[in-house]
Amino acid sequence: MGLQHAFAMVGGLIVPPYVVMRFAVGGDADMQQYAIACSLILSGIFTILNCVQFNIPGTKYVFGTGILSVLGTSFGFLPIYESAIAAMRAEENADGTDKYSGKEAYGKMLGTTMVCAMLEVLLSFVPKDKLRRMFPNIVTGVAVMLIGAGLTATGIKYWGGGAVCAEMAWKNNGQVYGLVGKGGTWFGPAQTGVAPFPGGGGRSMCDGNGEVIKAFGSPEYIALGFSVVLMLVIVELFGSPFMKNANVIIALLFGYFVAGVSRAEGNKFVPDTKIKSAEPITFAWVENFPIGFYGPAVLPLLIAFLVTTVETIGDLHATYEASEEDTESEEFDKSVQGGLLSDGVCSFAAALATGMPNTTFSQNNGVIALTKCASRRAGVCCGLWLVALGVLSKVSGIISSMPDCVVGGMTTFLFCNVFVSGLSVVSKADLNSRRNRIILAISMGVGLGVTAVPWIFGDQRGSPGTAPFWACSGPFREGADCNKGERGIRDGILILLTTPYSIGTLLAMTLHAILPTDMEVVGYSADGGKA
């Protein structure tokens, strides 16, 4: 049973570290392998601790859930890590050199995560009913949907060949460049002497697919990604219950196999260099990152921990129901308190061990429902399997050698699943309510808008045709530069505005706090009569 739970988790565990390390250090195979191994090891250790509940001496509080509830690296923090690391990597010293290396940027995010994780620790001592009132389904659902929407865009970029070359392809061959190519002008006749959209129509080549280097969106990349989706459908049609619960890892391995036997102009999609170079065993702390603090990421991270707090309560409720336990009992309240404390402490410990924040995984509730086994021993065995898979770094070598397009086919499915989960949460709210519809429309409108057009608040495409949201140098400030404090405030606001679920969740929380109930809007008093 433990292995079955581990298989249900592995696909989701490897994606966040894989994507973040691609952002931070590019194609460094050793760093990718380490990050994946670290995610598996830490998730295994924390799952064991979470399943085995501990009393805190001298208090009425506990640590851990005491049920079959697993912990894993959270998708919710991925967009913030991407945005913050990208912002730090874009900073330069006076001589034009990079201010932060990828490892330094990641280290700063780890330090900031340690500080922000204390919020969830504090919230673990707040009664769950108060948390539910503060963050109802309409707010939590918006947050989860926008996490999924933003990440799905990242998944599609990987499916087409890679996230970096996708950005360059859009920059060089975007819709506006098409206008220029047809005889249009960038600025119009009033602006002269300004070069048209940069890039000159050159192709953006993707280098994250083994020895194969082709333009973004090449048919070979699309086909390999589609092989993963095809296997997902086949498993759902013909697979056993066990296979359906392990559909992510089965489809990923199938796509990996297809890529392994495929060639493009004699070049391999899966060379064995990364597997051969991987050490036999590894563990956390093998790699070091200079721990720091990045102020601009604080508010987005705090919002993320608020969201995971409410998600954890919902996940534990689902676990109790799948385990056929009473959700109105004192034991459930104790599990919620211990689970939230476990989430916060383990996220702190994960950052201390160079990993990303952890939270409860909901997909394992399906395994419980199908197998009718809710024993904590299965959770402990699951944790041991995850640790074993992480320690055997050849496993990480195999995973890191997967072509970006194969990973993209899987992550598009996984990330959109997050969106669907949020949709399920929102559906529990009264969507006939005028108040809820306004909250949903405004927060989702802005959040999805930022997902579709992220450069509205910042010149992320590097084009001469968009104004920087808050310029720190250049013609919009007539050569003036921001001081350190102003730049920090600017970067913090920019990360908040360009991370879809941060701005969307903040709007939903604000509207929930200030909008009157429908009864008050239409002029009825609380006892049902006209006011």
Where are these regions (language model features)?
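Hydrophobic, small-residue-rich membrane helices and short re-entrant helix-turn-helix hairpins
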Residues: 238-253, 275-293, 297-301, 314-341, ...
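Membrane-embedded alpha-helical modules
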Residues: 84-91, 98-265, 381-529
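P-loop potassium selectivity filter motif centered on the GYG triad
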Residues: 46-47, 75, 185-189, 193-207, ...
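Short, non-helical or kinked segments that cap or interrupt transmembrane helices
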Residues: 30-37, 59-77, 133-140, 243-249, ...
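N-terminal signal-anchor module of multipass membrane proteins
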Residues: 1-68, 75-84, 88-99
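Hydrophobic alpha-helical transmembrane segments of multi-pass small-molecule transporters/permeases
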Residues: 2-6, 66, 109, 113, ...
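Hydrophobic, membrane-embedded alpha-helices of multi-pass small-molecule transporters
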Residues: 1-13, 214-228, 245-247, 260-264, ...
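Membrane-embedded helical hairpins/re-entrant loop segments and their flanking transmembrane helices
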Residues: 21-64, 300-376
